[in-house]
Each structure stands twice: as C-alpha cells, then as structure tokens.
C-alpha cells in the first residue's frame, strides 16, 4: 500500500526543514521509550527512526506503533530502519536503508510518496546517491561510534563534499554531540543525526536543545547546498520539497 499521494509533498517539506534526527531502539537501555521520545521531541528532534535488530517481530511492531503515535502528536517524521514491510505495516512516513542496492526495492514496496533514506560513507557514495530515488542521505560516520562497530570514521571531508554536490538533503552522522556539533555544521551540514547524544543523556530534552543551540551558533547563513535542493529531483522530476 502506497502512502496517500497528498502526503508526499508535505512530508518532503518537513524533511527539508528538519534539523535534528534521532535513531533509537525499541527498548533504549531499559528506559521508558515513550517518555524518552517525548522528551527528545520536546527538545527539538524533528525525525525519529526506529532501529531495532534484536527483538522479535511482535515487540518491534508494538514499538513502531508507539513511535508513530508519539510522532503524530508532535508532527514529527517517523522512519523505520531497513524494513520496508514494517514501514508499510505500521504506516511509517518512510524507511532508511543501508545499501545502495536496497533503494529500488524500498521505493517499489512503499511507493513514490514515501520517504526513503540511504546511508553513505564516502564522497563517491554521496555522488552515486544523486542518481537514486532517495529523499535524503546520511553521511558518516564522521567519528567512530559504538553504534556502528567496525565502521571506520570518515571525518568531515564527505560532509563538505555533500554540501557542494548532494542533490538530496543530507544529515551528518556518527559520534556527534553538543561538544563537536559546531564542527559538523561549519563543514557544511545543516542537519544532524544522533543516537547516544540524546538517547543516553540524563535529559533527552536538554540534550536536544543543546544540539540545536550548537547548530544555531555555527550556522551563519544558508548552506551552499541550498541551491542544489531547489533544482528538480532527478528521479521525481519535481523539487525535493514539493
């Protein structure tokens, strides 16, 4: 089942204006997941991704229902990690996939109005994503992070490259916290994706607010990518926000 056609442009506009993206599990460190999500969204998180690899299907589906309900309350976007079938079942706004060759299947499963995101790890992968039917990319990991064991850090160079060449909105990801977020923004990112910086904070709300303050302090004007985002999306033939 495709998402309602009228919702596609609205969701893409919300994606384009998003600044802070949180990935989280179904049971984050045995915390109350709904309380954590509500705190994070109150602090300024715009997008929630459910990324759960360990639990059974029934429990993941229950978590997805919670994520979707909370996101609807806060007018946030809800994305599912690596599972187009779950995204369709729980009526998520979209799916995030980790490999370029998974994009076409995700798009076919969810239809043209769903949001499809893709992980990229190099300048070459950023360029390759320009030709794929995705709505956003994540670029990283900028710094090593235990959430991606074995994945080497790529540094800030791919961020700067994406700011100049990516035709889709992009999020810097990997080891970002309030102490280094300004570096990522100064490299060209206008969107940040985090896990531990908000999930593991004593107050997710305060952590999200701190990240947004760091962003505001470093973002001294439009990104060089803004002009690229105003051009037609190659696969859709319309502007990414429309």
Write out the residue ranges for each language-model feature.
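Non-cysteine beta-strand/loop elements that form the S-adenosyl-L-methionine
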Residues: 98, 135-142, 195
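C-terminal binding/interaction regions
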Residues: 187, 191-194
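Glycine-rich beta-strand-to-loop/alpha-helix junction loops that act as flexible
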Residues: 139, 172-176, 194-198
